[in-house]
């Protein structure tokens, strides 16, 4: 599993080469004046669901442990004025901040895991209180201890004012559809909070080293593959049936699931060994309980995503501080989207789900 040091190196690499369509990278001191987005002459908010960061209070908690390197916060993951300036230049009004949960899932010391998450959640909440008109944040949780994770997200939401939870796609190789994790899912559903999943290179399903070499395939293939597997497990193992009010957001446009959903839709009909636990058609979950960000990078990719999932299930995402092409103008220029659809995708859906006023 990549540690925080490798993550920081990747952030630094992203900052070194800016894609032309993106604008200033995170960490630059000052960007252009704030870009404001309007549709049909009406100002609309833009909310970014896919915004990586770290918080400094974690470092002293992990100092002297095997996880000390994961406590480093540097470069574009730092929460500072440069981040706000870059948001301004890119037309982003709000970021929904998240910290990768999988940095800590290998910790077996329950007390240490709890103290790390408390430091993260309190650090995120403090930043959001300082900038309530620009940031909300997903709560972190110690998913390796599902009962603790449930308590942590409740504390994050009720005491700290955080919105939902950010998780990885598995816990040390164990599928999150396993009933062991039901206390976490039950709490998220009870609270009515969105759970945002970010993958980590499909290490749970790919042979070690298989995605090495050229092309950064661990990211390019592995991340969407892990997301596809994660969502498929939630569908076919009945998680969405056990928790019918649960809503799950998936990074990287929902992985490959929407791209080849016809195969998923008929699996329980044509495969006698599928042993499906779901009680509804897979598409019903796709169009009601699953959300995906806009990171498809093309007009046709967005058209297909909306056709499969519906505009109410699509939300804007950038993957900052990594310098992927921005998709804001793809949404704005999409001839197949109504003004209402564009407004919903860019911010309306998340304003509602994350209770942004």
Regions found by a protein language model. Give the residues of each.
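Short, surface-exposed connector motifs at secondary-structure boundaries
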Residues: 132-137, 161-163, 244, 284-288, ...
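Short, flexible hinge/linker loops that cap or flank conserved catalytic cores
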Residues: 39-40, 189, 242, 284, ...
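Active-site gating loops and adjacent loop-to-helix segments of metal-dependent hydrolytic enzymes
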Residues: 43, 52-78, 107-108, 114, ...
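Hydrophobic faces of well-ordered beta-strands that scaffold small-molecule active sites
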Residues: 47-51, 95-97, 137-139, 165-167, ...
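Acidic-and-aromatic substrate-binding clefts and catalytic sites of carbohydrate-active enzymes
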Residues: 73-77, 105, 143-149, 172-179, ...
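Active-site gating/metal-coordination segments in enzymes
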Residues: 93-238
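Mid-to-C-terminal alpha-helical segments outside catalytic/metal-binding sites
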Residues: 2-45, 49, 55-94, 122-130, ...
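Aromatic-lined glycan-binding groove of carbohydrate-active enzymes
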Residues: 236-238, 244-282
